[in-house]
Amino acid sequence: MAPARLLIIDDHDFVREALEARLSEAPGLEVVGCTGCWRTGLRDAVKLKPDVVLLETKRADGQGLEALRRLAEQCPHTNVVVLTSYPDEEEQTQAHRIGAQSYILKDIDTPQLVREIQAAVRPQAMI
């Protein structure tokens, strides 16, 4: 089976770089892009067609849910996993309504994060 193609969108430089390093080493995953700007991430998602986008919605620009909406509209075959440091029940509900596959906290360990990403890919395999 081909590795799951992953795009990371997170405006926290240190966190984004750490995620890229952690997930680049994970078997079964290929990090195809990594950016802090959601607009750049959206363009990358349209161009690269990742299986999964890992998206931080609690952004300094306040545009996290807008980024999710745009991804859902423009990349309907890409699943989005929201990964955040700041859990928010209302945002979680909105994220799922918009189309997020899952909503998880950044303190998750790497093996569990990889499982969440792989679980987000599975529905596509059935199409």
Task: Mark where each language-model region is.
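Acidic, metal-coordinating helix/loop segments flanking the phosphotransfer/catalytic sites
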Residues: 36-52
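Short, conserved "switch-loop" micro-motifs in signal-transduction and mechanochemical regulators
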Residues: 86-87
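Short amphipathic alpha-helix used as the core "switch/output" element in two-component signaling
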Residues: 65-77
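C-terminal output helix
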Residues: 90, 108-118, 125
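Conserved acidic segment of CheY-like receiver
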Residues: 2-15, 19-23
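Conserved phosphotransfer microenvironments
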Residues: 38, 54-68
